[in-house]
């Protein structure tokens, strides 16, 4: 009986340990590191992943040799980027040089998500972001036997307020499809001085509203 009880306790302990491990949240690498892990879902001869910042190209990953390509003037981003900063992919297939410069082309290049990193990149191509400054909120994931659970952000308003919300996306491991999206609310909400809808200013204005003086009762004249 003692041996049976001991075995049962060990089984429960191991089960809970495996469950806790599967639910443990892990942070994604930075955006450039995440993009370097993607694998093309098409037959290509060679390809380059390039980060372009202020007109300067920086090759982040090279598979084979791509000849005779021109640096484009625009590309894609999957995080919060500077104004003159983007990524692009150049690949060679069937003797032709092709480019990936927008989210739709990026999704086609990756195809179905083969792992959690590709799932995050595909979600970002649909408008979500990996927020490198707030990975605890919008740049981490957990998983179980059936699904990935991605905590990602989204820029929902650029001014009055500047707002970012974070979401939990459930991605099926087999299909690579997002099956559920949970809105966890705003984690960044900033108002500048020009915002007339700033809640704090509205509260101050409400407090400063002058109260109407009570009407003075007419004094009775003495006879």
Segments predicted by a language model, with ranges:
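A structural detector for beta-sheet-dominated domains
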Residues: 81, 90-93, 100-101, 142-144, ...
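Long, low-complexity, intrinsically disordered segments
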Residues: 211-223
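Bacterial Sec-dependent N-terminal signal peptides
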Residues: 1-25
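Short, solvent-exposed aromatic-acidic interface loops
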Residues: 181-195
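Extracellular/mature segments of secreted proteins
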Residues: 202-206
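Acidic, glycine-rich flexible loop segments
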Residues: 118-167
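A short, surface-exposed beta-strand/turn
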Residues: 162-181
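Extended, low-hydrophobicity segments enriched in charged/polar residues
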Residues: 25-132
